C-alpha cells in the first residue's frame, strides 16, 4: 500500500517537471536499471499484421516482432502483448477458427516458440490475446453443431452425447432477442452472437468448454507464453459478474499450476466500480478504462493541467481494487486498438502527448503502451482499421513497412 500511495505522490511531484521538460525540450541521460523479475511490467501492445514485415509480403509477422525486440526493450518495455495471432477469417482475428495454432499469415508455431525464447533472453514477458467469449462461425465446433441441429426433425431435442458441440454454444429453439441468429440450414434453431453473427458466443459455463480452454492453455504455455489477455471478459455471461469472475478464476488457477509466474489481464470495459468487482476473480489485472480512454482520468488531468484530480482517482483505484484483491496489479493505458490514438485525442499537441506518457509511467501497476504511441502516431476516421494502421519506422526507408 505504501508503494501505491507513493506513486500517487510522485504524480504531484513530477507533473510540473514532466510538463516543463516537454516544453523546454531539454533531454536527460537516464541510467539503465535492473528491473525485478515479477509481474510488474511495462507492456507494449502490438497488432502483428501492422507492425513489422520480415519477409516483404506486406504483412507484419512474428519474425518481424522478433527483429524489433531491441527496439521495444530500448523503449523501457519488458512485456509484450500480441493481439490475436490464432487462425481467423478476418483481419483483426478476434474470431478464432483454431485456438491451438498460429495464423499462417503471421508465421508458425515454431516462429512463436522462437519469439518467446528470444523475449525471455532479453527479460521480456510475452502475453497473447485470447478471444474466449466467442469463436468464429467457421470454427469446427460451431459448424459441426449447426450441421447436427439442421438435421434434427421437427420437435426433436438435441443430444450432446451424439454431438457434444451443441453444448459449446448458446443454442435455442426460439429467437430470444436481437443478438440471436438462425442456425444455417435450420428454421427451428437459433444461436447467440452478442458482437456479430459471425462470432457465436461460447457457453463458458460448460465443463467441456472449460476443459477445451485448459488444453488451449497447455498448448501455449508449452510454446513459452507468459500470460493471456482475456478479451471481452464481462460478456462471458451477460450481467453476471460473479459467474464471469468464476470463469476467469478457474482458468487462471489452472495456468498458475502450470507456471507460477503466469500473468492474466482482462478487458472489462466498464466503470471503475465494475472493474473493481472483477478483481474478486483473484486474477491479477484489469485494464483501467476509468484512467484510460479519451475521457479518462489521465487525459482529463493533462487537458486541464490538474494533477490533483489524477491523484484522487489513483487513490480511489488503490482503495477499491485492493479491497477486492490485495495483490492486484493495475493496468493503466492511454489508448488501445479499439479507440482513437492518444495523439488524436490530444489534437497532436506534442507537449500534452509527452505529459500524458510521463504520467502513465508514474502510475502504479503495469502500464500498457499501444504501438506507435511512442512516436506520436495518429489515425484518421472512425473505422477500427484506422486505429490499427501500419507502424511508421522511417520517413524514407520502407524496409519492414506493412501494407495495413
Per-region residue spans from a language model:
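Sec-dependent N-terminal signal peptides of Gram-positive bacterial secreted proteins and lipoproteins
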Residues: 4-24
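Extended substrate-binding grooves/exosites of carbohydrate-active enzymes
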Residues: 154, 194-195, 241-257, 261-263, ...
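Catalytic grooves of carbohydrate-active enzymes
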Residues: 218-221, 336-338
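Noncatalytic carbohydrate-binding groove/subsite architecture in carbohydrate-active enzymes
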Residues: 268-360
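Acidic/aromatic-lined carbohydrate-recognition and catalytic surfaces
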Residues: 22-203, 208-211, 222, 229, ...
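Loop/helix patches that line or flank the sugar-binding groove of alpha-linked glycan CAZymes
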Residues: 34, 38-39, 258, 312, ...
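Short beta-strand segments
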Residues: 45, 81, 227-230, 265-267, ...
Amino acid at each position: 500500500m505504501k508503494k501505491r500511495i507513493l506513486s500517487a505522490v510522485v504524480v504531484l511531484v513530477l507533473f510540473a517537471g514532466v510538463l516543463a521538460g516537454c516544453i523546454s525540450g531539454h533531454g536527460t541521460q537516464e541510467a539503465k536499471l535492473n528491473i525485478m523479475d515479477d509481474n510488474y511490467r511495462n507492456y507494449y501492445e502490438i497488432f502483428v499484421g501492422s507492425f513489422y514485415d520480415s519477409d516483404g509480403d506486406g504483412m507484419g509477422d512474428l519474425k518481424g516482432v522478433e527483429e524489433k525486440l531491441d527496439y521495444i526493450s530500448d523503449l523501457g518495455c519488458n512485456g509484450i502483448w500480441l493481439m490475436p495471432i490464432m487462425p481467423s477469417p478476418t483481419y483483426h482475428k478476434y474470431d478464432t477458427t483454431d485456438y491451438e495454432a498460429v495464423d499462417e499469415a503471421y508465421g508458425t508455431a515454431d516462429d512463436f516458440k522462437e519469439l518467446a525464447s528470444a523475449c525471455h533472453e532479453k527479460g521480456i514477458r510475452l502475453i497473447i490475446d485470447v478471444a474466449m467469449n466467442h469463436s468464429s462461425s467457421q470454427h469446427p465446433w460451431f459448424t459441426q453443431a449447426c450441421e447436427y441441429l439442421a438435421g434434427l426433425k421437427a420437435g426433436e431435442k438435441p443430444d450432446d452425447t451424439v454431438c457434444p458441440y451443441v453444448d459449446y454454444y448458446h443454442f435455442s429453439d426460439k429467437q430470444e432477442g436481437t443478438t440471436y441468429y438462425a442456425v444455417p440450414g435450420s428454421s427451428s434453431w437459433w444461436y447467440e452472437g452478442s458482437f456479430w453473427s459471425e462470432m457465436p458466443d461460447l457457453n463458458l459455463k460448460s465443463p467441456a468448454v472449460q476443459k477445451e480452454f485448459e488444453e488451449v492453455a497447455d498448448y501455449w504455455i508449452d510454446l513459452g507464453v507468459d500470460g493471456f489477455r482475456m478479451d471481452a471478459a464481462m460478456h462471458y455471461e451477460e450481467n453476471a459478474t460473479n459467474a464471469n469472475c468464476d470463469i476467469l478464476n478457474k482458468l487462471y488457477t489452472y495456468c498458475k499450476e502450470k507456471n507460477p509466474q503466469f500473468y492474466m489481464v482482462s478487458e472489462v470495459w466498464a466503470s471503475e466500480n465494475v472493474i473493481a468487482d472483477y478483481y474478486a476473480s483473484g486474477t491479477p489485472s484489469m485494464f483501467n478504462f476509468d484512467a484510460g480512454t479519451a475521457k479518462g482520468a489521465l487525459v482529463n488531468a493533462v487537458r486541464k493541467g490538474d494533477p490533483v484530480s489524477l491523484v484522487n482517482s489513483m487513490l480511489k483505484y488503490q482503495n477499491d481494487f485492493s479491497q477486492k484483491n490485495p495483490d492486484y496489479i493495475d493496468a493503466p493505458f492511454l489508448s488501445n486498438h479499439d479507440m482513437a490514438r492518444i495523439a488524436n485525442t490530444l489534437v497532436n499537441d506534442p507537449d500534452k502527448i509527452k505529459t500524458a506518457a510521463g504520467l502513465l509511467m508514474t502510475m502504479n501497476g503495469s502500464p500498457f503502451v499501444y504501438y506507435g504511441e511512442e512516436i506520436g502516431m495518429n489515425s484518421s476516421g472512425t473505422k477500427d482499421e484506422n486505429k490499427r494502421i501500419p507502424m511508421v519506422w522511417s520517413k524514407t526507408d520502407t524496409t519492414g513497412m506493412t501494407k495495413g
